[in-house]
Amino acid sequence: MRLRKIWLLCNLVCIIPGAFAQQFIHPGVLHSEKSLERIKRLVDQKAQPAYGSYEILAKLPEARADYQMKGPFEIISRDGKYGYTKGPSERDFNSAYYNALLWKITGKKAHADKSMEIIRAYARTVRQIPPTNDAPLCAGLQGFILVNAAEIMRYTYMETHYPNGWSEQDTECVEAMFRKVFKPVLSKLFQTAPYTNGNWGIAVAKAQLSFGVFLNDRKLYDDAIDFFYHGKDNGSLPNYIAESGQSQEAGRDQQHVMLGVSCFADMAEVAWTQGDDLYGALDNRIMKGYEYIAKSNLGYDVPFVKWKDITGKYSHLSTFGKEGMGRFRSVFEIAYNHYVLRKGLEMPYTKIVLGLVRPEGPGFTCDNTGLGSLLYYLGDDLNTGKDRGRIEEDLTQLKAWNFSTASYRAVNGVMSLVSSGVKLQKRVQYDSSAYPNIVVKAPGIPASANKKWLTLSYSISAAPESWEFDSDKAMKVGEDIYVFKITDVRSKNGYSFSKALTNATMTLDFGDTCGEPVVI
């Protein structure tokens, strides 16, 4: 009898190939049900930096439930005759994704319906990505954003629960779009002799991996992972990031470097959601790529070797590329939260970068999702342990500041703000009645700096008001701590600062420091 059972089991496996193959997790491209619940919980708790990233998302035009779709287009392209569709279709795909996220965060059906409207419109309409030069980037980058939106809606807004929800017809139509319009473009790049910089192959691979999940197509998924490890292309991991962390494109502008390495992180996060660890590949090679980017773009010296790329076309890049240096994209949270908060490793230079860019805003066009402080943050609320409404800023920590007019980099081995006009801003909550003293620790302000470098501002009756503080009148504690009293100043129109807990903008404007760095 026992032998008969074994014989029957063997025959069952033969009759149903893949019957015991690992099933895909849904929703499960970038976001599992568990991760979507975590995102909502962080927003409900107003936990920072996630809530700050959410506030940025909620204000984006593409995130509105009444967003006016620019398409759909029968043909989408990044260049050539139909290149005019690039911007509009990118905004539409981002809108589908943002509204899908906001549906899960807020529970508002208007966001779900907007996402469904865009997904359905393109699934019914788009029929081609023409074979122009940039076709792989169009299918890879834009396809990745759209499939993430579709995955969320397919498994969280079904017609069995909502009148306008996802139906079997939607499944057929959307799957057909991805298979017939997007997938052939991806496949063509894999089948063609290598001819591009590495970010192309990585963008294509992350989209194919994601389509594999959405389409429940194990071969698509496995082929993408095989390319990740073994692809004879600049876009495979060993061919793109060296053991030192230097990338194949490190001699180009730094935005392409950030695109390439962050696409690996996107790909690794999709695989992680499915139970596969690409993050750990080649001794955490993606982490090393991030640390190299962070360290070099902060102004530290890094090793650089002339790269012999797979195509032979780009081996002339003999020095580190300084174009775009220090302009950090919103791509750092995803890797930091995995390696540091999931795995307990250290990323000291990426940590510094996050001090500059948190909360992360949206991605650049469809290159990445951005918003990582909302989507991937796994740490404690940064407000925990702080007295609500108190302003005590330590510039040596440099958390959550936004500065478009200052570059943060190492000067003679010391981290400094350098620019012809150093200006930083951040959003704060201030309770002037409970905490009349505003404390700022600023270790190295040049003598040539603007004396009235601290300002608080908010609107009264829709009119902007600002309170300006003179550092010469501040109480000094030691050489680097300034204590300003809110009761000593009035706004330019004579108002006292509100005694209620107030959302305000805090600005540090050091002005033209004659080339001297603001050492922090």
Per-segment meaning from a language model:
Residues 21-194, 248, 273, 278-391:
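Extracellular glycan-targeting catalytic surfaces
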Residues 139-142, 201, 257:
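An alpha-helical repeat/solenoid feature that recognizes helix-turn-helix modules
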Residues 410, 415-493, 509-518:
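Extracellular ligand-binding interfaces
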Residues 213-304:
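Long, repeat-rich segments with strong aromatic
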Residues 1-23:
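Bacterial Sec-dependent N-terminal signal peptides
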Residues 175-204, 208-218, 227-236:
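Extended amphipathic alpha-helical interaction segments
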Residues 494-508:
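Noncatalytic modules at the cell exterior or secretory-pathway interfaces
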Residues 386-407:
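Extracellular carbohydrate-recognition regions
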